[in-house]
Amino acid sequence: MAQWQWQQEHEAKRRIEALVFEHRCELEDDGLDPDEIDRRCAEFRAQLNTTAAPPPAVVDEVSQPLPRLLEQLLSPDDRAAVEQAAVVCRRRYPRLNGEGDVTGSKAHAITYLHRDGYFGRDHGPLLKKITGAMARDWRGPPLTVRCVEHHVYTEGGGLVLEDHRDLGSSLSLSVLLSDQYKGGAFTTTEDGVTTAHVPRVGDGVLFASETVHNVSTIESGERRALVVELWTGPATTHDRSK
């Protein structure tokens, strides 16, 4: 087998196992019996293997390099709408405030804004503005919204998992909503080189989802951000997997 073929198969298996792990976390949060969790995960893995797609494409990085900064993507009114959406979703969907996300913690709260199609339905023009900016230079197959998430990092919180990637997605965007904090540097790592991005409030960092990215630990204050992922799979209305 050629090296590139092996790499493609390896990446496909890695993506599937990452999705299965996320699914297992969600089932554990729902309080299911361990045997039932194993059974459902086996079914989910079989389904993913049956419908496995080629690795997600990304934009032409020669003409439009990634990561890149989308300056002042969100206006003050846009940011206020996002914050209000987070308030609504925390009240309306209390069980779906990111409990199934392996990166969440008491100091890193994640709220799904796309649950039951809420954000696209109640904030359609804003979502279209965001996804349009993300996919402006897209050269691959049609993209759909995988997730719209509101993140709040408080002291001690961060995204420090080694080799963290948004597996299965094609494009990811992180928009800074606040700047009253210390620490919390947003970085991407490619080919062993780590780059620190310094967005202003309202700026978004757009990057290929398979890029390793992290948020350093918050030393004080509160870091708020909007995260949107696009992929070639079906639109989700529950969490990141379904």
Give the location of each predicted region.
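RS-domain-like, Ser/Arg/Lys-enriched low-complexity regulatory segments of eukaryotic spliceosome
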Residues: 1-61
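Amphipathic alpha-helical protein-protein interaction segments
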Residues: 5, 9-16, 30, 34, ...
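Generic preference for well-ordered alpha-helical elements
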Residues: 13, 17-20, 34, 38-41, ...
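Amphipathic alpha-helical interaction motifs in eukaryotic regulatory proteins
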Residues: 24, 28, 38, 42-45, ...
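Short, flexible/disordered secondary-structure transition segments
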Residues: 30-34, 38-39, 93-97, 140, ...
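Short amphipathic alpha-helical segments embedded in low-complexity Lys/Glu-rich regions
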Residues: 37-45, 98-105, 144, 191
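Non-heme Fe(II)/2-oxoglutarate
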Residues: 58-140
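Catalytic core of non-heme Fe(II) oxygenases with the double-stranded beta-helix
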Residues: 128-242
